[in-house]
């Protein structure tokens, strides 16, 4: 079994120190925040993946509100329980029809033993991304975020995330958005 270096308090500090040495803009941000920056993390497995799908192309506040309402409907937050909820309830909670279809499809794949999210923990990053993006509703952003937030992989980064691109633009004082 491959052993991966995972995000924890020690590796977060190492990463901050590395960034502060390499990039003055990061150093300034880290010092302004007194290095008190919480990592982006989610629960591993079904709940984390569904949370990321809800977040696709939404503001953080909107996504959190919708997912909070979904968690009231789905107790416990399992694929089986998810599938037992009338899809109209998810629509009332603010989830789009398309995302309801994506989430239901993922839940069904898990219930039918066609998707094993636990097995992803032991796979290389590229393999995890490859397997996830084969699933309807999951693109590179979601797969990269799953690696970073749910599996806590250190070298995962959702490079196409508009919020991160704009933050880098501001930090570097760039006129134009950087490309990836």
Language-model segment annotations:
Residues 1-2, 53, 109:
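An N-terminal domain-start capping segment
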Residues 51-66, 92-99:
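A short secondary-structure junction motif
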Residues 37, 71-180:
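Catalytic cores of DNA base-excision repair glycosylases
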Residues 7, 20, 58-72:
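Short, compositionally biased strand/turn segments
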Residues 41-48:
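Short, contiguous, helix-prone interaction/anchoring segments in small proteins
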Residues 1-41:
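Intrinsically disordered, low-complexity, charged terminal extensions of DNA damage-control enzymes
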């Amino acid at each position: 079994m491959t052993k991966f270096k995972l995000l924890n308090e020690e590796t977060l500090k190492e990463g901050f120190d590395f960034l502060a040495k390499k990039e003055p803009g990061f150093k300034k941000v880290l010092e302004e925040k007194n290095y008190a920056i919480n990592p982006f993390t989610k629960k591993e497995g079904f709940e984390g993946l569904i949370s990321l799908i809800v977040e696709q192309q939404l503001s953080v506040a909107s996504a959190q509100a919708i997912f909070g309402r979904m968690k009231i409907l789905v107790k416990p937050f399992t694929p089986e329980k998810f599938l037992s909820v009338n899809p109209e309830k998810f629509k009332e909670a603010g989830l789009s029809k398309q995302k309801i279809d994506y989430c239901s499809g993922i839940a069904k794949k898990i219930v039918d033993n066609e998707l094993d999210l636990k097995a992803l923990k032991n796979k290389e990053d590229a393999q995890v991304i490859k397997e996830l993006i084969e699933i309807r509703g999951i693109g590179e952003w979601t797969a990269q975020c799953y690696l970073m937030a749910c599996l806590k992989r250190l070298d995962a980064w959702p490079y196409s995330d508009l919020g991160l691109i704009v933050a880098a633009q501001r930090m570097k004082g760039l006129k134009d958005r950087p490309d990836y």
